[in-house]
C-alpha cells in the first residue's frame, strides 16, 4: 500500500479481476505461410486463444480503493507478464494519474518478498559494470520501467492528442466521469491499442476505466454511460466490455445505512461507515454540497448545480439610479 503496509486483496478486487482474466474464447484465423524456399505459400488455419474482456468500466463510490485496483492490474502487467508491455495511467489531472503509480513506487522502496527483492537489488547508477548488478525495476523520469522485460508504465494527460496512437497493452483511466473532457479518452486509447490485433500472436489489450459518479453533465461521461446502459439492458450485445456499476436505486435509501453497501462494496474495509454518516449529515446541513455528495458517495448523479444564498443576499435592495453619472466604454478593435 502507499503507506508501506502489506496489501491484502479485497474480495471485490478478486471478483473484478476474475471477470477480466477468467474468460477466454478461441478464434480460428487463416494465416498466410510462405514456403521455406521463399517461392509461393499457402493459407493455414490457426486457433488463437483470446481474452474475452478488453475493457472494464468500474463506477463505484469514493473510498472504494479504485486507484489501488488499477495499480494492482498495472503491477501485474509490469512484473508478472513477461512480454514487453507499454502501459499508461491517465486521469483529468496529473496528480490523480500519479495515484496509480505511487503504490508501485512504495512496493519498490519496501522490496518485500522474493520477486521484489530480486527486481530491486543493485543500483540504477551502475551503468558501466555488469548488467546483473543493475536494478531491474526502477522509477525513472519516464515512469516505472522494468528493465528485464523492457516494459514501461507511464503517466499521460487525459487529452486526445496525447493518447492517440499508443500501442498500449494495459491502460487505466481514472475519474473519467469527473473530468470536464469533451472527447472520449477511452476510445482514443482503444484505437491505438487495437492496432496490433491482426497478427496471430495473442496480444490482448486491457483498458480499466474507474470512476466515481460525476456532477459534470456536458462532458463525455454521459454518452459513455448511455452506451453502458444499453449493454446492461441487452439492447446491444458486447461481451468484450465488463461493467461494474454500483449505485443506490433511490434517493430515499441515503438515510438507510444498510443500503450504503450497494454504492460501495468495500464499505467497512477501505472506508468507514462513520465517514459516510458524516457525509450524509453534511449534505443535509449544507445544501451547496448536496449534489456532489450524492454523486460521489452514493452514485446518484444530480442534474444542474445547487446555489446557496445567504439571508442577506435574498433581501430586496433599493432601486439604483445611474442618471448623469460618468460612464466608461471599451472596445477590442484588434479583430
Model-derived segments and spans:
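Phosphate/NTP-binding elements of NTP-utilizing enzymes
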Residues: 1-331
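Short acidic, Gly/Ser-rich segments with clustered Asp/Glu that frequently serve as metal-coordination loops
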Residues: 333-335
